[in-house]
Structures are given as structure tokens and as C-alpha cells.
Curated annotation (Swiss-Prot):
InterPro entries for this protein: Ribosomal_bL28, Ribosomal_bL28/bL31-like_sf, Ribosomal_bL28_bact-type, Ribosomal_bL28_sf
The species this protein was found in: Variovorax paradoxus (strain S110)
GO cellular component, one term: cytosolic large ribosomal subunit
Protein name per UniProt: Large ribosomal subunit protein bL28
Annotated Pfam families: Ribosomal_L28
Amino acid sequence: MARVCDVTGKGPMVGNNVSHANNKTKRRFLPNLQYRRFWVETENRWVRLRVSSAALRLIDKNGIDAVLADLRARGQA
């Protein structure tokens, strides 16, 4: 399963570890993903999403109904 946020689409990024001697080795920056259940009042059920911390803030700001409507418009839910 991919490490991708269901709401924002954020995934791993690639960068470098940089040592004190300025040696560089490749590494991955993983998004802060959490499985969360959200109660959808209009549907009277729980919805389980894998979301990043940024997506949690987005859901707090816009509401779960607006976020789910956007997901369905994109064809992801």
C-alpha cells in the first residue's frame, strides 16, 4: 500500500542526509500519516481515512462533509 494521504495526496519526497563532513546519501522524507475515523453526520456513519497532519487541519477548517465532497468530485471516494 502506498504511503499517500487520502485527502491531500502527499507522498514521500526524496532528499539527502548530509553529514558534518558534507557527505550526502539519499533518503526519503515520509509524510506524517495516521489512520483516523471521522463521524459523518449527514450519512450517519464513520469514515476511515489515512490522512496527513496537514489534512487533519484541513478537515478541522473546512469540515469532513466538504472534504468528502471534494474527494468524490475527484473520484477518490
